[in-house]
Amino acid sequence: MIEKSNNPFLSIDPIVERTKSNGEGLPLLSEKTKKGFDFTQIVVYLVGLSDGLTHLASLAIYYLFKDYFRLTPYQVSLILMYPYIPFILKPVIALITDSFSIFGMRRKPYLFLFSLFQSLNFLALAFLNLSVIQASLILFFISLCASFCTTVAEALVVESSMGQTYSQGTNKVTEFIASKAIGSLSVAYFSGYFLEKMPREYIFIATSIFPLIISLSCLFLKEKEYSTNRNIFNQLSDLIKFINTPIFLGPFLYIFVYMSGPDYDDAFFFFCTNKLGFRPSFMGTLRLTYGIASLIGIIIYRVFLKNCSLRKTLIITTLVSFPIYISPIILTEHINKFLGISNELFVLSGGFLIEAITEIQLLPLFILTANICQPGLEASVFATILSVKNLGSLTKKGTSSFITYLMKIDSYNFDNLSLYILTCGFFLLFSLTLVPLLPNEEHIEKLKNKETSKG
């Protein structure tokens, strides 16, 4: 899961600096909010935090399909494809929220309704006796609600970044992403610990509380009312025109190819639990280290890499990540025993480094969007970038399931797992062939001059 700026992107001054730097003209932020206490940012952080906190249920969901429904690795990969579908539809969701108002508002009602619906779906997992299909459908609805909520929050991030300096915009984007990482970090260990101490139904009930906090907090969100809706077809035309430039198409293709290759995560989860005997509490500890790594990746980017070019950042991080990514082969072939490294320590260190690199690769594209997005398309453009990533993730689940099945890897047969890990590693390197398609400083400067001349 890796994505992300001579940062050609980072050399761009926000186009909206053609307007007033205090954010005047932003469509959805009230004057009171701009001048006084910025409760909008608080809500944004709460959405990110809640999105991370709902990971409390992630291990319980894994074990639900693995132990309760007794599915094999390739079946679990297939099931976990469906929750990605709503995130692929983020541009559609964003166009809806950008175009259609509810009671004259385009953010607050969507945030309230879908966070409430998400909470109800977690309660359904806890209280209903479900079949595999029904449980999969509920996971789909949980993801649909999360997709709506994060799309609204991302639009608010972009809106609040417009009209500000690049540094201010960078801070807002990274703070939103960090709030997600903090949420995941807060519950990572307990996702496994609680699974050993209590029934998974209690975990689903506890998780349902976090979206409810969003529903309550957004009641205090100040938003300007709109008397009319925008034409969604005009919005779609503007969106296509805006993203149909080399500055976006190259990164879009790179991210999709990078994300769509097979990944050994699901098969390796079965290996760790069934072969190595790792308990849920250790799997929670593993997720805790991933949360810490995400924060460290964000810090490294902000301190050391935000002035590096996009191409350089992606090439270096991909090459560095390759040996780390295939390092579980040392575990599956028991080489770590000869090196005197325990199974647990080896798994913790490798996953930690991969997660940090993932965050470093994601950030430049997010920051690019926040700084050059034209007014009226805030949610749509940001969501399109994430949709490309999630389409790749959906494809990844499909290719992972297919190759896992071909290699006859199941719940207890891991004879070909090392070959599978190596295959996934080479798919990772394949994305480097698309680096020439990424924008350089000249392309960035042309876009900058073009947009400036429009102003």
Curated annotation (Swiss-Prot):
Transport of folates is inhibited by probenecid and methotrexate. Its main location: membrane. One of its GO terms (molecular function) is folic acid transmembrane transporter activity. The chain crosses the membrane at residues 42-64, 84-103, 110-131, 137-157, 177-195, 201-221, 242-261, 281-301, 313-331, 347-367, 417-438. GO terms for cellular component: plasma membrane. Glycans are attached at N307, N416. It is found in: Cell membrane. It catalyses: folate(in) + H(+)(in) = folate(out) + H(+)(out); (6S)-5-methyl-5,6,7,8-tetrahydrofolate(in) + H(+)(in) = (6S)-5-methyl-5,6,7,8-tetrahydrofolate(out) + H(+)(out). Keywords: Cell membrane, Glycoprotein, Membrane, Transmembrane, Transmembrane helix, Transport. The keyword Signal does not apply. InterPro entries: BT1 (IPR039309), MFS_trans_sf (IPR036259). It is a multi-pass membrane protein. Belongs to the major facilitator superfamily. Folate-biopterin transporter (TC 2.A.71) family. Folate transporter with broad substrate specificity. Transports folic acid, folinic acid, pteroic acid, dihydropteroic acid, the folate precursor p-amino benzoic acid (pABA) and the human folate catabolite pABA monoglutamate. Can transport 5-methyltetrahydrofolate with low efficiency. This is Folate transporter 2. It comes from Plasmodium falciparum (isolate 3D7).
